[in-house]
């Protein structure tokens, strides 16, 4: 399967120059790109743009939000009409760092110690980005021209649902396969989906706190309600639906009950001198790959409207709903579509063979318990695999770390896959 002499030289180069790979991770981490607050990735993306231009890539860079640009670098294949193309995708933004967190070392000064590299974003996912870039540089160092197109995407906004990847798809970038180098501990993964939503209970009349007795006691004469208290019924209804889903729904690769409804944030009322005339609940729903977020939204709304009909006041003042969004920052909403993997596909079979050839171990296929931008690539019709270095429990954590051996092995596996995939003729 492999042109061993070429592959062996490439892999030896990675081993010989792993300090350069680690230095690249450190450079990327040194650009503080936490999201939120976001709007801080331009310098890091300019570095990546320059890096890719030196490799002979055609580079496209555009603002998704002010000071938050995407970068897409294309290595055009020598026979791109006949050979398979590949997208390497990753996000440059990282999880926020709170001042109260107790880091052993400064989070944006990545340090190497006892076989790990530590710093914000090393696992999620500047380690994966560095592996992609270093693999491309290794091909360039050996003057290897791939027959198929290689497209590298460094995108913004993943941490807050801003879907820089969706912007790439809308700009027309496509391929025969996409690999998202996000945190998967080098397992080949698909994922469930996530959608957030706002549920609002609103009274058309505002009551003084002094009239509460009239609202709740016999003979009070006022037909009104506290929006906060009515929201409590809806939360109870969500919990009942969540338990029902856990019993009645399942999906291969997921433990029972992964389809959750999280009442994540609530706000309501004006101040203590008023009966709360409005209450808003922000929820996060995880759903399975065989479901669509449109189906899930309909199911939740239908259930809560039935709950409301059982309440005399909410029967006349039903809750309203707002779903999804384009940004947790801009409009307080997000969608991450689900995607499944085809274990019999050429891509999965090739990646399995390469991993076994290089490590002597079978690579696992599974479903991620979190979400990535991979769903947007899949929704655009691109077969997609989540395959990247780092453990999920390290992502977003204080003292975030990545095992160096895993990063190096991932880089070698990815490099080999790039070479082999882009030398396969289109089906």
Curated annotation (Swiss-Prot):
Q: What is its EC number?
A: 3.5.1.-
Active site positions: 93, 158
Q: Which GO terms describe its molecular function?
A: hydrolase activity; metal ion binding
The residue ranges crossing the membrane are none
Going by the record, the broad EC class of this enzyme is: hydrolase
Q: Name one GO biological process term.
A: thiamine biosynthetic process
Keywords, comma-separated and alphabetical: Cobalt, Hydrolase, Metal-binding, Thiamine biosynthesis, Zinc
Q: Which domain of life is it from?
A: Bacteria
Cofactor: bound how, per the entry note? Binds 2 Zn(2+) or Co(2+) ions per subunit.
Name its pathway.
Answer: Cofactor biosynthesis; thiamine diphosphate biosynthesis
| Role summary | Catalyzes the deformylation of the formylaminopyrimidine N-formyl-4-amino-5-aminomethyl-2-methylpyrimidine (FAMP) to give the corresponding aminopyrimidine.
Which family does the entry's similarity section mention?
Belongs to the peptidase M20A family.
Q: List the protein's name.
A: N-formyl-4-amino-5-aminomethyl-2-methylpyrimidine deformylase
Species = Halalkalibacterium halodurans (strain ATCC BAA-125 / DSM 18197 / FERM 7344 / JCM 9153 / C-125)
List the top taxonomic levels of the source: Bacteria, Bacillati, Bacillota, Bacilli, Bacillales
């Amino acid at each position: 399967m492999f042109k061993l002499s070429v592959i062996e030289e490439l892999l030896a180069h990675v081993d010989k120059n792993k300090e350069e790979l680690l230095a690249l991770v450190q450079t990327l981490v040194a650009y503080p790109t936490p999201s939120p607050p976001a709007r801080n990735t331009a310098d890091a993306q300019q570095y990546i743009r320059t890096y890719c231009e030196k490799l002979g890539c055609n580079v496209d860079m555009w603002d998704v939000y002010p000071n938050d640009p995407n970068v897409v670098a294309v290595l055009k294949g020598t026979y791109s009409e006949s050979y398979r193309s590949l997208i390497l995708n990753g996000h440059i933004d990282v999880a926020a760092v709170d001042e109260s967190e107790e880091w052993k070392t400064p989070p944006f000064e990545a340090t190497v110690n006892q076989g790990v590299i530590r710093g914000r974003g090393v696992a999620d996912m500047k380690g994966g980005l560095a592996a992609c870039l270093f693999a491309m540089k290794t091909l360039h160092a050996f003057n290897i021209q791939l027959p198929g197109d290689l497209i590298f995407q460094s995108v913004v906004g993943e941490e807050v649902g801003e879907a820089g990847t969706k912007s790439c798809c809308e700009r027309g970038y496509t391929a025969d396969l996409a690999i998202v180098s996000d945190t998967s501990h080098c397992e080949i993964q698909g994922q469930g989906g996530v959608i957030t939503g706002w549920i609002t209970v609103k009274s058309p009349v505002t009551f003084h706190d002094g009239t509460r007795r009239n609202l709740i006691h016999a003979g009070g004469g006022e037909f009104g309600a506290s929006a906060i208290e009515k929201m409590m019924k809806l939360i109870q209804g969500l919990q009942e639906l969540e338990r029902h889903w856990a019993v009645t729904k399942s999906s291969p690769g997921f433990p029972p009950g992964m389809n959750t409804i999280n009442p994540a944030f609530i706000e309501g009322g004006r101040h203590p001198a008023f009966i709360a005339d409005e209450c808003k609940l922000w929820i996060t729903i995880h759903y399975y790959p065989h479901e669509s977020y449109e189906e899930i939204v309909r199911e939740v709304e239908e259930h809560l409207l039935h709950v409301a009909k059982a309440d005399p006041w909410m029967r006349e003042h039903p809750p309203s709903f707002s779903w999804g969004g384009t940004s947790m920052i801009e409009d307080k909403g997000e969608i991450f579509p689900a995607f499944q993997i085809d274990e019999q596909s050429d891509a999965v079979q090739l990646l399995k063979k390469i991993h076994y050839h290089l490590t002597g171990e079978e690579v696992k296929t599974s479903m991620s318990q979190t979400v990535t931008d991979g769903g947007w690539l899949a929704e655009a019709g691109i077969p997609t695999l989540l395959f990247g270095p780092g453990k999920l429990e390290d992502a977003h954590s204080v003292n975030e770390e990545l095992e160096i051996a895993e990063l190096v092995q991932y880089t070698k596996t990815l490099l080999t896959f790039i070479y082999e995939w882009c030398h396969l003729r289109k089906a």
